[in-house]
């Protein structure tokens, strides 16, 4: 099963989503596009259980995460954009 999680440039680099994730799917990586100089990344997306804790933890309600399960199915984690 193919997984891709996209976290768009609305991330403010606060690390709330990283700390909330029970399966350590997310991590912060250097990124010059925000004041914090870092952005959430998802190197271990195969471990995502779709719990939406990252969504709940996001203080700006702009975290955008999508999980793509193969070509036919797209499961949105329900995050605002």
Curated annotation (Swiss-Prot):
Cellular component per GO, a single term: chloroplast thylakoid membrane
Locations listed in the record: Plastid, Chloroplast thylakoid membrane
InterPro entries: 4Fe4S_Fe-S-bd, 4Fe4S_Fe_S_CS, PSI_iron-sulfur_center, PSI_PsaC
Reactions catalysed according to its record: reduced [plastocyanin] + hnu + oxidized [2Fe-2S]-[ferredoxin] = oxidized [plastocyanin] + reduced [2Fe-2S]-[ferredoxin]
Occurrences of domain 4Fe-4S ferredoxin-type (ranges): 2-31, 37-68
Binding site for [4Fe-4S] cluster 2: 21, 48, 51, 54
Cofactor comment text: Binds 2 [4Fe-4S] clusters. Cluster 2 is most probably the spectroscopically characterized electron acceptor FA and cluster 1 is most probably FB.
Top-rank lineage group of the source organism: Eukaryota
BP terms from Gene Ontology: photosynthetic electron transport in photosystem I
Cofactor requirements of the protein: [4Fe-4S] cluster
Positions with a binding annotation for [4Fe-4S] cluster 1: 11, 14, 17, 58
UniProt topology in membrane: Peripheral membrane protein
One Gene Ontology molecular-function label: oxidoreductase activity
EC number: 1.97.1.12
Keywords of this entry: 4Fe-4S, Chloroplast, Electron transport, Iron, Iron-sulfur, Membrane, Metal-binding, Oxidoreductase, Photosynthesis, Photosystem I, Plastid, Repeat, Thylakoid, Transport
Subunit structure, as described in the record: The eukaryotic PSI reaction center is composed of at least 11 subunits.
Known role: Apoprotein for the two 4Fe-4S centers FA and FB of photosystem I (PSI); essential for photochemical activity. FB is the terminal electron acceptor of PSI, donating electrons to ferredoxin. The C-terminus interacts with PsaA/B/D and helps assemble the protein into the PSI complex. Required for binding of PsaD and PsaE to PSI. PSI is a plastocyanin/cytochrome c6-ferredoxin oxidoreductase, converting photonic excitation into a charge separation, which transfers an electron from the donor P700 chlorophyll pair to the spectroscopically characterized acceptors A0, A1, FX, FA and FB in turn.
Name listed for the protein in its UniProt record: Photosystem I iron-sulfur center
Organism: Phaeodactylum tricornutum (strain CCAP 1055/1)
Phylogenetic lineage: Eukaryota, Sar, Stramenopiles, Ochrophyta, Bacillariophyta
């Amino acid at each position: 099963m193919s997984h891709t999680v996209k976290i768009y440039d609305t991330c403010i680099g606060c690390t709330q989503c990283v700390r909330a994730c029970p399966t350590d799917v997310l991590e912060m990586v250097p990124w010059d596009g925000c004041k914090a100089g870092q952005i959430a990344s998802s190197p271990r997306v195969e471990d995502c259980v779709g719990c939406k804790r990252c969504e709940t933890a996001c203080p700006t309600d702009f975290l955008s995460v999508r999980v793509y399960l193969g070509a036919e199915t797209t499961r949105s984690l329900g995050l605002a954009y």
